[in-house]
Each structure stands twice: as structure tokens, then as C-alpha cells.
Amino acid sequence: MKVLKSIYKVMGCAILAASLSSCVNDWLDVAPSDGTDADAALTSSADLDAARTGMYKALKGNSSLVDYYGQQFFVYGDVHAGDDYQYNNIGGSNRASFYYDMNYQTASEFTSSTSSSNVAWKSPYIVIGRANRIIAAAEGGALSDAAEAKATIDQYAAEAKVLRALAHFDLVRIYGKPYTEDQGASLGVPLVTGVLESNAKPARSTVAEVYTQVVKDLTEAISSNALATETEPGYVSVWGAKAILSRVYLNMGDYANALSVAEDIIKNSGAALWTRDQYFKAWDASTPNESEFLFRLNVAGSTDNNVLNGIGNLQQREGYKEMVATKKFVDMLTSDPEDVRNDMFLPATAAQEVATYGTNKVYLNKLRGQGGNLRNVTIVPIIRLSEVYLTAAECAFRKNDKTKAVEYLNDLVKNRTTTEASLATVDNITLERILIERRKELIGEGQRYFDALRNNETITRYTSEADKGWHKTLSKEAQSFDRDYFKAIAAIPQAEINANPNIKQNTGYGE
């Protein structure tokens, strides 16, 4: 496999510039942008610390690797749905149009090459590769200070298991069918938990096998008691790991476990929902309110992906302005004028856009740059406490505990609006109401598309000219589709298939 062979070979290719030209797929072996060596031998806890830095940097990406949390994962998770957050047909420059238009037919159209990436593939496997090296070194017992630095070494290994789980989880949601569709029986992605030989050609594991490993990694990391108990921006703590685990269980349809983990976080983490008065300022990159962030990336300085291709610059009105809220979403949110989340959007200012959007607030303003610099977006959310409350509400409802569902839903709603009618009661709470609240809260955070797939929703951009809103003319299939449509899951990049014939392509895609 083109990517995996390069990641997991055993020191077969050094990262030194002098040797890069001799390496197959040597882009995978470049040092993190802070200069730490991502693939040098790990002989001490100090080496492990440098490798840890490289692992987190792979999660964030840089100007040349934008296929994960640096950019494309958020685009995929929101704009592929396109019912709440759409490509900006007027002011955009096609950086977020690929999955919105859905004009692709062949696997060759899917690429993870540098800044033109339209798929999340390279960077997640880089994260996995670097996590595997940390785990192997930490558990191998050969580090020079293994005894005196045991607590630090154990923590880094636990963090690596969490990030390995997260990367596999994100990959399988993109390239595999939803777990809830066939209980994971269909093909997922290559599952890699250790060093492979340079000529290895791993096949795709099933979705269920991938999820089993994801849960195993997360539960082992949590039960190790090695993860930090206090949340630190940029690094995963035990509460961040539990929040990810709750999200995983939710995507599996394991509502009992998802609820149990969510309630543990709500009751014991010490995290607190932002109040209505805090909400807008909480996203301020200069002075963020950390009380809701269970795991966020800390993007800092010119070494991280805060440049033109970062997700913040794609979303912002003064940036590339690639995405806008759909008319349906704007109508849904503004139906409650007291909802503070209305303040998270800005109106268009360019004349051509104003002609279409009018005074409606369409530009999401969550990821605003520090000091007004759009390239200095320091807050990149992975998971927040508000999502945990919404998970708890949904799972309680699905377990027929409406009282508890109302409690968790209203805990969130009363911190977003002063409108009493927006609060749920045992008599009027529905699953749809909970899912709508989830859409309002998490827009732009890369979860809408996956929620629609796991719930077997029909994703409807529009069905006629009457409800077309601000959408451009799309193919009939792109106007409205569900998870049975073959384009609902991405094609594995053709370059990977060419390098590894053991990888079977997703149905419907030619070369």
C-alpha cells in the first residue's frame, strides 16, 4: 500500500534531506515543521516527547498536508451533507466544492496530494504511524530512562493509543459504511497497529474489526490511568479520550455505553457548558474559554497549519469564504432570535453576495483568528462538552428515558437561549428535536454528515426550485440522497489501489 508501506517500514528511509530523494513516498518521512525528527530512533523519554510533538502536528497538518483536521475533515463532515452548510457558489474558489457538487465518478479524482487534497487519507495514516512508534517504544522496555520516567512514558503511550483510535475511527467513517447499516460487516479501512514490513500489502479490515480496535485502544488508554486528568489545550486528557469513546459508541448504535460514558464526563470531568453570555467570547482565539473544550488542537505560530489553507481561512468572510450556511439552516436558527448562536454568523458584504444572501448572516464565525489575523486560528475543536450533553440526551431518549433526555437537552438549550418555548418537555421531546439541536450546536465542526449517515437520514439540499434556497443547480442525485447511494462513501484514492492490489475499491467507482 503506497502510504502505509512508507509509514511503517522499519527505519528504511531516514528523514535527512540528503536521503529524501531515495525514499519511496518520502513526503511521509519529513520532519514535523518545528524541526523534530519524526522517525529517528526512540531511545529515551526525551525522544518520545519529540515523537509526541510530531504525532500531534500530523493531526493538525500544515500548508502541504491539509487532508485531516487542518482542513478537509471539517469540509467533508459538513459540506458533503450540504443541508446546513454548503459550498459558497458565489464567492468560493472550489476548495470546498468537491463533495458538495458530487460530480466525481472515478477513484482517480480522489487525491490526497498536498494542498489540493480532497480526501482524508495521508495525514490520518501518518498519525497512526507515529502513534505506533511511540507505543512500540514505550511498551518495549528499552528506553534508557524507562524506570525514572515511567509516568511520562505511560502517558505518551496512552495518548498515542487515543490518537491511533481517533484516526482509524475517522478513516472508517469516510471509507466504510456506517456501523449502524450492517453492524460493521462491510469493508472498512486497513487496520494497522504496529510496524509493517516495507513490502506489506494490508487488505481492508471490516468496519466491525476497525471499531473493535478503536474501542480497545480507547478503553486501554483510559483504564491505564496514565492520561492527564486536567484538560490541557492541544493534548488529549482522560476526559477527551472518554468523549471520543462516547462518540464512537454513538456511531455504533451502542446507546447504553455512549450514555454511560457521557454521564461520567458530565458528572465528573469538572467541565462546564458555556453560558449564553459566554458563548461568543468563548471562541476568541486570544482569550478562549476552555471550560467546554474536552479536546482541541492548539495551533500556534507559523509552523502549524494557520496559513491560507487552514480551515479557519476557508470558513471566514474575510478569507477564502468557501462555505456559507444554507437558507434552510438560517431559517431554522433565526426562528429563535434569542438564540446566541445567531451571533456566530456574519452577513455577506461583497455586492454580488449581498444580491443573493441579502442581510442574512451566512458566514460562520467560530474559528476567528487571533488578533484579527485569519491565518492565526489557534482554536481547532475536536470535541466539546456540548456534544456530550447532546449525546446523553439522544441516548437517553433512545433508551426510553424521556425525563433524562429532557434534562440533558434543556441543560444545553437554556445556556443558548432565553426563549422558554425552546425548552423541551417530556410531552413534546422527540428524537428529531434533539438532532436539530445537535445541528445548531455543531455546525462547522465536522459532524453533520456522519450523524446523517448513522441515522439513515435522507440528506436533502433541495427538491424543487421552490425550496432551492441558495444552492446552485445540482444533479438529481446530489439534490437528495441517502447512505445507499454509492457516492455517500468516498473512493479510496486510486494511487493506493495501484500500489496495493489487496485493497478492494468501494462499489461504484471506476479507475
Enumerate the predicted regions with their spans.
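Sec-dependent bacterial lipoprotein signal peptides
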Residues: 1-21
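Extended ligand-binding clefts on enzyme/binding-domain cores
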Residues: 45, 50-52, 60-69, 209, ...
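Membrane-proximal, proline-rich intrinsically disordered regions
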Residues: 3, 23-80, 281-283, 311, ...
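Conserved, well-structured interaction surfaces
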Residues: 94-175, 223-227, 375-380, 395-399, ...
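Short, surface-exposed recognition loops and adjoining beta-strand edges that mediate ligand/DNA contacts
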Residues: 36-42, 66-88, 171, 176-185, ...
